[in-house]
């Protein structure tokens, strides 16, 4: 008997606007005897971000029923968070999914609208007894699953309420997620083997006689999206579509300042080979069906071998262009396909390790991988799996002061929390090395004062993902911009501490419409009279000194973290408790933390606060602690008062204005 999935039955929602999943384990097994005896009724497989038949345990479990109905619903609540390029990928993936299912005598039903309405109708139409859906960690997707379950609870079905099973693709054989170490260092010591992917299941049941629906064109899909009643205002859509660098360099050019980038560089169009896997209009990411992704992955892994194939040469060229730092090209090229589930993480790992063994006569070296591309692919999916597991664990574990939510930004998992039901929107942004719990003593107090409060752990910190990429101030500012647009959905009062204050100032400078007011607490950044700063560049180069410096810094921080943090709380050292230090130490062992620390050596704070805030016409409050160990507080405060007359700047632990 082979265990293929660990779905869990949904419970009723526990409170208004909050859906909770009961963690009753239900092990789905497929044995030869079970294959011969089909379960009664039919099963609906609800595809969301699992657009494949390969290594799809939900489809495998459903194949044991008398009939299977694969379903994909173009739902505004999912699609509204996709870029146009991601929408293109969805269409190509669905085209391949339909083709693969038709080869087995099945199909995928295509519908437009609210998924709960279609599933409710289909249950009676096809006599479905079970619904299979992949378990998610993103808040909006978990909400949608909860809404489906609530709809079932209030509907009288002819043959009774169907069960909803949540399935996973287990990267590791983990019996109980709560038993998993919270430290990645301890997790690595377990040496858990990665499970092998499964092949596409055989759908031997009868084909249902239903209207499967046509696959839309991209224009049809865009028309549907434009009819979205919850569509963002056009001005906000434009805000997201223009990069921070583009806006900033345009502002600098108008003010006569210098930059190292030329925005008017024209790139000649490159003719794509006939078998190109770069299927979108922009052509920056790998797309198509599972087989196309596997072909591109084979080309990526074999980069050092060279090739005469045009399609593989194209992959190699894109790899070189996307390699902003060693290994960063993998997620740049394959990340969207992984996020849409066109290929599973463990399939990528399996293919990478298989190729590594082929290169080394069947052996794996204990000293690491033999090629950069194998390391990039294997490390990326292992890292993604770790953060997915930690996100899921934080969602199902009881306890803790604040409820955790997950938002996916550019393919990466970001943790945040929310408090308050009414009032103005407030967004709290932490400093370097911290996380949203930095404000654990403030969140509820601000909410009880009549506000709705969001606190986010930005990329690279806390329990948010720490990908292999180049970290810049503009990248973090864009994350905050998108969080306001996608999660909060309205202008906010922005509060930032330390380097988080600098990110907040950039957001206020570049996107006035998103910010109602700004509060900077011991903010990073300087004040330069008349903005006579050096030329700005968003280009960052990794170097040997930065590589070494990050490792020495990490070693030093782990040894001295308690004393360092206490210096930042000179009048309230009791706040530096065991939990805070333990969580900071835990995060220091996360995969990718060294990449984040390397960014310290390339921070570019050349844009002074006085420049960033001068065009912001709303209220600005600057709070500077006089015992701040990081800066010369008195000198900085005097400069702020002189060159930022629009800001109110009280002094903490000293004389006030």
Protein language model annotation of sequence segments:
Residues 39, 183-391:
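Glycine/tryptophan-enriched, flexible segments
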Residues 505-510, 514-551:
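Flexible "cap/lid" loop of the alpha/beta hydrolase fold
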């Amino acid at each position: 008997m082979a265990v293929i999935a660990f779905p869990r039955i949904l419970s009723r929602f526990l409170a208004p606007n909050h859906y909770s999943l009961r963690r009753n384990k239900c092990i789905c097994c497929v044995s030869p005897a079970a294959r011969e005896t089909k379960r009664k009724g039919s099963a609906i497989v609800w595809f969301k971000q699992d657009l494949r038949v390969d290594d799809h345990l939900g489809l495998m479990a459903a194949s044991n029923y008398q009939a299977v109905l694969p379903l994909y619903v173009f739902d505004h609540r999912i699609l509204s968070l996709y870029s146009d390029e991601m929408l293109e990928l969805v269409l190509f993936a669905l085209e391949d999914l339909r083709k693969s299912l038709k080869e087995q005598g099945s199909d995928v039903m295509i519908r437009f609208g609210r998924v709960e309405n279609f599933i409710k109708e289909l249950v009676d139409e096809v006599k479905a007894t079970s619904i299979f859906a992949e378990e998610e960690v993103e808040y909006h997707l978990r909400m949608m699953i909860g809404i489906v379950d609530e709809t079932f609870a209030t509907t009288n079905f002819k043959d009774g309420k169907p069960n909803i099973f949540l399935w996973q693709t287990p990267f590791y054989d983990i019996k109980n997620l709560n038993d998993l170490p919270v430290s990645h260092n301890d997790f690595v010591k377990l040496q858990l083997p990665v499970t092998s992917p499964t092949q596409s299941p055989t759908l031997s049941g009868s084909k249902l006689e239903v209207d499967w629906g046509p696959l839309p064109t991209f224009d049809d899909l865009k028309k549907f999206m434009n009819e979205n009643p919850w569509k963002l205002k056009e001005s906000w859509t434009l805000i997201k579509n223009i990069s921070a660098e583009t806006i900033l360099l345009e502002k600098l050019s108008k003010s006569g300042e210098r930059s190292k980038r030329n925005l008017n560089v024209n790139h000649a169009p490159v003719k794509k080979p006939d078998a190109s896997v770069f299927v979108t209009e922009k052509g920056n990411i790998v797309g198509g069906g599972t087989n196309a992704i596997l072909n591109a992955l084979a080309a990526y892994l074999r980069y050092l071998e060279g090739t005469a194939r045009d399609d593989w040469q194209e992959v190699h060229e894109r790899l070189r262009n996307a390699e902003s730092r060693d290994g960063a090209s993998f997620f740049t090229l394959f990340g969207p396909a992984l996020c849409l589930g066109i290929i599973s993480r463990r399939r990528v790992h399996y293919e990478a390790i298989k190729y590594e063994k082929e290169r080394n006569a069947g052996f794996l070296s204990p000293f690491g991988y033999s090629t950069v591309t194998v390391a990039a692919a294997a490390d990326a999916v292992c890292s993604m799996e770790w953060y997915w597991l930690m996100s899921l664990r934080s969602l199902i574990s009881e306890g803790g002061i604040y409820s955790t939510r997950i938002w996916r930004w550019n393919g990466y998992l970001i943790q945040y929390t929310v408090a308050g039901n009414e009032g103005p929107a407030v967004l709290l942004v932490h400093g370097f090395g911290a996380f949203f719990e930095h404000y654990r003593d403030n969140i509820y107090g601000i909410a009880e004062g009549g506000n709705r409060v969001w606190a986010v752990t930005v990329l690279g910190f806390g329990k948010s993902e720490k990908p292999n990429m180049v970290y810049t101030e503009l990248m973090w500012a864009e994350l905050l911009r998108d969080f306001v647009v996608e999660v909060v959905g309205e202008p906010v009062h922005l509060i930032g501490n330390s380097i988080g204050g600098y990110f907040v100032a950039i957001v206020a400078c570049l996107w006035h419409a998103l910010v109602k007011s700004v509060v900077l607490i011991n903010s990073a950044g300087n004040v330069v009279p008349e903005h006579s700063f050096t030329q700005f560049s968003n280009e960052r180069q990794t170097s040997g000194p930065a590589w070494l410096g990050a490792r020495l810094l990490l070693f030093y921080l782990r040894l001295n973290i308690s004393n360092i943090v206490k210096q930042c709380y000179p009048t309230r050292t009791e706040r530096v408790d065991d939990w805070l230090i333990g969580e900071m130490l835990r995060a220091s062992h996360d995969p990718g933390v060294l990449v984040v620390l390397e960014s310290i050596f390339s921070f570019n704070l050349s844009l002074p606060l006085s420049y960033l805030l001068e065009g912001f016409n709303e209220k600005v409050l600057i709070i500077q602690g006089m015992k701040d160990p990081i800066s010369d507080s008195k000198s900085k405060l005097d400069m702020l008062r002189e060159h930022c007359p629009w800001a109110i700047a009280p002094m903490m632990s000293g004389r006030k204005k």
